[in-house]
């Protein structure tokens, strides 16, 4: 019998995952996009599988094999999805992943992220200064989205006239229930990025996308046009949405933990700790992108059969009481080192430095510029 991972279960995601950690750490489940999967919830198991070569990421090849077994071809929508997303390193296995990561890492460096600091810091302060005194503010719409949209667009070199659509695309592509909107957003994003890449080939700038176009290894290997689109989409989808959630979660955690907020105000140098504890305590991503078992895997007294989809819950792993003492307490003085919010192993999130920078600058700007910030509604009214 498979357990449904649906909206009802996710109403109390932490409670749901805690029960599974205790009773079924490797649980057969069904969810919106994966009718048959194994959900892994314990820290030790999640971390082990993140570094296990038997867990595969090439979902396009898996989909093609399944379609062939059903004596059919991939639908046009499936072709779009697997072409657009399957070309990024997150959905590739070695040696393809190794090659892509090596090329991307040449351009997407800590220095490239650090160059954004002055601009993002100034914009964060400007957004907070624009809050009307005593007014109710939509923190996501008026602060987190504009800040993170600016970050990813400045990083990639997206022109001003193309930035308005990015948040809508990211929302639709990340929404498991978007239906037609998912494919429409994906097609629009692919069309826009493909055209932009060709323009930057002719007129390169100092942005990441221009640098990704230019990078090559010692053998002259470069990213193909498809790989450039897929990598840009990865940054848009995974990076943008995750950073919005990180900022929103940070503010919610602080405002619902007055003692921790007071500690931060007393010692602003704790802002780095705040971001790491938020990443642990309220991970922006619950379940990491789809993987599958390349061969049968014995784990935690159970078996994940070959070909089964593997869902790794970092949200659950980061609340595992065997690793983090008193895990359901938000504590900005604890060492949250070792959390899995950005993954682990060769697929560790390349955008982690950017997300951390955005989170730190956002929290610092809000604490400094809005000393009387408080929730406008009860926490249980938020969604």
Regions found by a protein language model. Give the residues of each.
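Cytochrome P450
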Residues: 1-383
